[in-house]
Amino acid sequence: YTTAKDDDFLLEPNDLIVSANQPKAVLAQVLFEPYHHLSDSLSYDITAWDIPHAYGASAYALKRDISVKTKKTVSYKGKIEYENVYAFYIPWGGKSAVKALSMLHRNKVRVRSARNQALLSGIKVQPGDLIVLKGDNPHLPDFAQTITVLLDGKKDYEVIESGYAVSGGDLGGEGYPLLKAPKVLLLAGDGVNSTDFGQVWYYMDDYADYPATVVDVKNVAGIYFDNYTTIVLADGYYDFTDNDKTRLDNFVSKGGKVVVMGNALDLFEDRKGYNLTRFATDESKGDSDKKADDDALASRYDDYGSMIRRELAGTISGAIIENTLDVTHPLSFGLGNSYYSLKTSGSSYQLLKGVANVAYVPTGYKSFGFIGNNLKRKMSGTVTFAVEYKGSGSVVYMVDNPLFRGFWEAGNLLFSNALFQVN
């Protein structure tokens, strides 16, 4: 599924096998078929979906059955007996890890995140994995018992008896920064896309189970931003005054984080002090303007009856697009080596200057579903998710909506990274 090519793979314990020869074979085909047949390109809804890309999972389609011993549940490594508890290790990835971190934050437990690979007495630590050190939490009366209870729903955590690493950095060093428990402000109301706001709210309430303060955008002038560490601006058109924008700038400069989605990026586009621009160079902008003028001249001879069909060339109602990841950046932790974004709008920005372009569409990218020909040509070299650092804070730009309908699990994890991992 990742390369769209034939390849060898190793079947390992706890891998999932879905048979196509079963009573629900048609449903299995629908959920795993990446290339959906479209009877007509006129569509009001997404035109591609499949479980491997939605979950960011490594998956293979087989032409023959395989005969291996199977089981109905996932097996977890048993907890070893330990004499000393130095720390707890929690692998990062998926809803259970996000809920575990949320639970720890809500109970005032200090948590660290690995920034590099390391090997700790049989535990392979990956970037983004969580470490809870006993030394960081002297306020907990019974450290081992408290963390064990809080992680009751997380089956794959491990107990670490020593902070010395076989390879990579020792625990507690600069390679394991403390994560700040975010204080989240979410704006709603006039101008904010109600569906996209609802998707963020659902994520906070159900997926992460983490508190967020919801305030009507008309009251933004009365909000004391310093009471929060993170502001989420869901897709929409925010009618901020110049004073509101200045206050937002100061919030970021002093260490705050703003997560901006969809059309909300307009607040930062072409603004002094930020590097969010549609085009990387004046030449690129000139070429785009010239093509638009040429197309407008040519369209004078177009007939009215084919107008809707012609407009399709520059639209996308929902397709899967391959993205290259900067795997070293916290925004990409747990996502693997590539990310497939579910793109539902034609909005695009060329790769940004002076910004961490964490996920971007490469040249010759793979795609699934319908994309208009004109738009498809423009997508190469455009950024999907980026982080701009300003002063002590940051702005996370989300051109695509990773929370679309709440079912794109890789997107849910990416948003979790923006909320919890990007300090």
Task: Label every model-predicted segment.
Residues 1-423:
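Intrinsic-disorder/low-complexity accessory segments
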